[in-house]
Regions:
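The feature captures the short pre-catalytic strand/loop hairpin that immediately precedes
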Residues: 5
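Active-site rim elements
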Residues: 9-14
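Face-selective signature of the C-terminal outer-membrane beta-barrel domain
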Residues: 17-177
Length: 181
């Protein structure tokens, strides 16, 4: 950014403070020489923010009222996430001398609160400590099923097939994302 004396400067606390904790459970089972199964569950908790300096930011973009004739201000903002991501994957596998077959799928869900705060502004307008300039709860669900097969027709020729069906759904509504549904 450029300071009031015209010098190019960098914000000292430009930072990314985001943490994720991951938890997983895996189960593999050999049923016979030809059959086995795999099952996994996962959960990730994420929380944190990044902070940066915005030069000449429009008051309107932050839900703030202009101060006198000023329509913009330098400010420091934080963009926060507090989210959960969880799901499962599974498959059944068959393997013989001529056929390899995998049938499986997955289901995952993301749920996250996203919000932004102005923590400092050169012209403070009517903002209060802790005010949010956007606030959103977003979700994403993703489910799929698949079948993969490889059949050995001869020593040099094999036949391969892969089918998948997938459904993905997003939902969000904020100044940052617009309406997503």
């Amino acid at each position: 950014f450029t300071d009031q004396l015209g010098n190019i400067r960098f914000y000292d606390n430009e930072t990314d403070n985001y943490q994720q904790d991951h938890y997983q459970l895996h189960w593999n089972e050999k049923i016979s020489d030809k059959w086995n199964t795999n099952l996994a569950f996962h959960y990730t908790k994420g929380k944190g923010y990044y902070e940066n300096y915005k030069e000449d930011a429009a008051f309107a973009d932050y839900g703030l009222t202009p101060v006198g004739s000023e329509v913009s201000t330098d400010l420091i903002r934080q963009k926060w996430l507090d989210n959960d991501f969880y799901g499962t994957t599974f498959s059944t596998n068959y393997k013989s001398e001529k056929l390899n077959l995998i049938i499986g799928g997955a289901y995952n869900k993301y749920e996250g609160t996203h919000f932004g705060k102005v923590i400092w502004a050169r012209f403070a307008s009517q903002s209060e400590l802790g005010d949010r300039y956007y606030d959103d709860f977003a979700t994403k669900t993703d489910g799929n099923l698949f079948v993969k097969a490889n059949f050995q027709l001869s020593e040099k020729i094999s036949l391969y097939g892969d089918l998948q069906i997938r459904n993905v759904h997003y939902k969000a509504n904020s100044l940052e994302t617009g309406v997503v549904n």
